[in-house]
């Protein structure tokens, strides 16, 4: 593999990794405050893709407006999921919440299967995203550089929120000790709902970017992507926002470059990502940026 092809694959890997990272942030933040793996999170990504397509293609809104409306709607939808499915089980066992999360996931997948059918739909987006730019012998699409850039900018914005605002301080406090937070008069449920809203909006954005890059959507599109995003969160150190982004980029890079090096194994590209995750966890079970000294996540 020559240098130009390798650089091309690096860009493609970073783009795919950025999509995983956006979804992984939601996994890691919800886990941080609830110690819950929200299996419905990846289906919110699917909802975001369908919502954007509907608002853009059927309603006729400008694409940017459709995306922003989708982010807001999915944020509210995430809060609704928390309010209806998870809040009544705050004091229940973790296995009860886990089963509920799986139930919400199955419900959303089957609901959209009934509403839109089980067949794949073409995701139409403005031509701008698929226009190419040449940098020497490296040719990349606009979406390939936009995704990593926006992912990094959003990471910086989230870190600012977590460490420079009182809402961020409250989020970190809930993640550390929710019972003490309640004794201090802070509405923990409100903070948890805020986390669900933020994570759901990011998942929706990840779904939009993924659908632009791989322009077919269906009600089950979130299953495999969600597993990879969860793997990215675990790889980076679940509970660490920076780790989730780092894990997403590493996973995307590994998946794309491995297939480029071994094209005959292209049918097993999904296995490369999980194999790499297993190898890392064998040597560092807490993930790359996880801290085994901390029982509670502090982001």
What are these language model-derived features?
Residues 33-37, 76-119, 161-168, 173, ...:
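Short loop segments and helix-boundary regions at transmembrane helix junctions
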Residues 27, 60-104, 111, 246-251, ...:
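Alpha-helical transmembrane segments within multi-pass membrane transporters and channels
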Residues 1-23, 51, 63-66, 92-97, ...:
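Membrane-interfacial amphipathic/re-entrant helices at transmembrane-helix boundaries
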Residues 88-164, 191-194, 215, 257-265, ...:
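Transmembrane helix-bundle core of multi-pass membrane transporters
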Residues 2-19, 161-166, 192-233, 256-270:
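Inter-helical junctions in multi-pass inner-membrane proteins, predominant
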Residues 16-17, 138-217, 241-247:
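Helix-loop-helix "hairpin" substructures at the membrane interface of multi-pass membrane proteins
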Residues 11, 33-80, 84, 260-264:
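Membrane-embedded helix boundary and interhelical linker motif in transport proteins
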Residues 18, 27-49, 63, 91-96, ...:
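Short, non-helical or kinked segments that cap or interrupt transmembrane helices
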